[in-house]
Amino acid sequence: MSTVNKKPASLKYKIGKVKQIPTVVKDDKTGLEYIQVQSRENEKVYGVTKFLNNYREEEKLGQGTFGEVFKGIHLGTNRKVAIKRILVRAEKDLFPITAQREITILKRMNHKNIVKLIEIVYDESPTPKTDSTSPRPVGNYHGNNTANQQKLITGKHFFMILPYMVSDLTGLLHNPRVEFGMADVKNIMLQLLEGINYIHCNKFLHRDIKTANILIDHKGVVKIADFGLARNYYGSPPNLKYPGGAGSGAKYTSVVVTRWYRAPEIVLGDRHYTTAVDIWGIGCVFAEFFEKKPILQGQTDIDQGHVIFKLMGTPSMDEWGLAYHLPGSELTKTNYKSTLQERFSKALNETGLDLLSKLLALDPYKRVTAMKAKKHPFFFEEPLPNAQLTLPNEECHESDIKRYKSEMNESMSQRPPSAPTGHTSTDNSIRAVTGAAFPKEASIPKAPRPEHIKSTIPAQPSASRYNGAATQNIPKEPIPTAPLPKGPKNSIPTGPNKLPPNPRDSYASKYPAESRFGVNTRITTESYNAGKRYRNRGGWETGRDSLNYNNNYAPPADRSHHPTIQRPSAPRGGSYPNRYQNQDYNTSRNTGYNQYSQAGDRRSYRPGASENPGTIGHGSSQSTQKDSKSSHSNNVKPKDVADYY
């Protein structure tokens, strides 16, 4: 028994229940490609009910080449949805081929990080709509040409119903009230890599990765949207062995991807690109978190190549040899050095910079894949990615950027005027009048604020100060003029009256003992200044250790009230003690306090350094008092001077 081989039925390209002729029609004026749509009589288009009976359009969210996106409500469930209107040519029932690709690809996608296509809706009005009579915006045209409006406005409308997302990444980055921490950035990047890896493993190219196409719902889940430029990829799916994926040999158009997110191989005119073009866009999004704006803003296609090489450096033959054989190889004659590390070193550590450099590798076959980028050490170091992303209680979309800018301008205009900074010198005023360069250094320096002065003082005095030990490297601080609080012995003052800690403070300086003459001889400013003047005139011995003097000695403010204390007259030729530099004097100066040395028929008084370094002040009980039994001349100090000092 023989069987007859029947020819298999020809597969017809279908979307829903609409049969389509696989003939692509190209518009001569715009260069856009369409598919001619033909349906049978009395056939329900796309198998759904009429649009007006199920959905209601509200505000406009965005606009694209082939349609507009609105915020809408499903009347049956009162659920918010996003309605994407697809432009249809009226004269020949032409359906955009990019919309057809987007619909077919979204129907095959099922991932948490990819936007879900709910349904396709068809609405047909009996008469063509116009902008003035239609209750909702129809058509997508540019300019004010009435003829173009009539071509684009038609009675047939196709709508893609998508879940409504409260925010997109562009709106969040431009919102001044939103700040992303590093843990939030890692959370978003991991979700983005998960979604793009799913797309590549299913052998598709997105070809329009940018912040405006990255949506985030109210639960913090990232969704990749806008598959209008997506298409099938005929190469092998990416894997861990080949970083940039294997090329398929198929030619693709180079007019894809928004210019600022366009990969360098597309900029140089390569049409045999791979899935690495989407990885470059993810690298641009990653860097945009830290500058709040696109990092590669080229004005033209040629300028875009210069901007890329200024950031990553001009590639050599070893780094990217294919670049010298592409149509745009003229850009390789530049000589730029990479500025990536210098530009982002403040925001990223070495691990983060390594991930960014691999995402933005110039050679597409050396560029990291999404599968491998997910395992980068950057995502496994502190701070770890947040388990759930937290968003503000407001909607943030790309259409809100103008509102954010106006809010910033209003807040700046409502600020009070700044305080005057003072007048400039006459010389600078003459320069300003004559047109000479006005130096910035000419402004009057501002006095340091109290907190600046306080910050230079250590938090607490050194421990050696409480036991009286001398420290040689203690900075000299100005003596406070405020009255010091008095307290009990062996205690430290507390409460609001406590002064800032001073490294030169000791118990003796905090609670000074009044002298036998009723004058504070240790800490008062007047006594300090008076003693300093008196010492400079030679009244005090210059051989005294300056550090011990500054720390432990202070002469009285007025010595005239004590008749027994008189300033010794210094002999001609120098201060009083320095004239008597003999062996007896040098020997006696180191034996203790209040020692006298015999020098001829004159006596010199020299208080030597204390042998006990822990002694505080001159009136210590450890220093022995010795009276001189020899006769004194008029230039000899009385013996009770030692008691005073």
UniProtKB/Swiss-Prot annotation:
Transmembrane regions listed in the UniProt entry: none
SUPFAM superfamilies: Protein kinase-like (PK-like) (SSF56112)
Alphabetical keyword list: ATP-binding, Kinase, Nucleotide-binding, Nucleus, Serine/threonine-protein kinase, Transferase
Domain Protein kinase: residue ranges: 55-379
Domain of life: Eukaryota
Recorded coiled-coil stretches: none
GO biological process: positive regulation of biosynthetic process
Chain residues that bind ATP: 61-69, 84
GO terms, molecular function: ATP binding; cyclin-dependent protein serine/threonine kinase activity; protein serine kinase activity; RNA polymerase II CTD heptapeptide repeat kinase activity
Keyword ATP-binding in record: yes
Kinase among keywords: yes
Gene3D superfamilies: Phosphorylase Kinase, domain 1, Transferase(Phosphotransferase) domain 1
Broad class of the protein's primary localization: nucleus
Catalytic function, reaction form: L-seryl-[protein] + ATP = O-phospho-L-seryl-[protein] + ADP + H(+); L-threonyl-[protein] + ATP = O-phospho-L-threonyl-[protein] + ADP + H(+); [DNA-directed RNA polymerase] + ATP = phospho-[DNA-directed RNA polymerase] + ADP + H(+)
A Gene Ontology term for the protein's cellular component: serine/threonine protein kinase complex
Family: Belongs to the protein kinase superfamily. CMGC Ser/Thr protein kinase family. CDC2/CDKX subfamily.
Protein name per the record: Serine/threonine-protein kinase BUR1
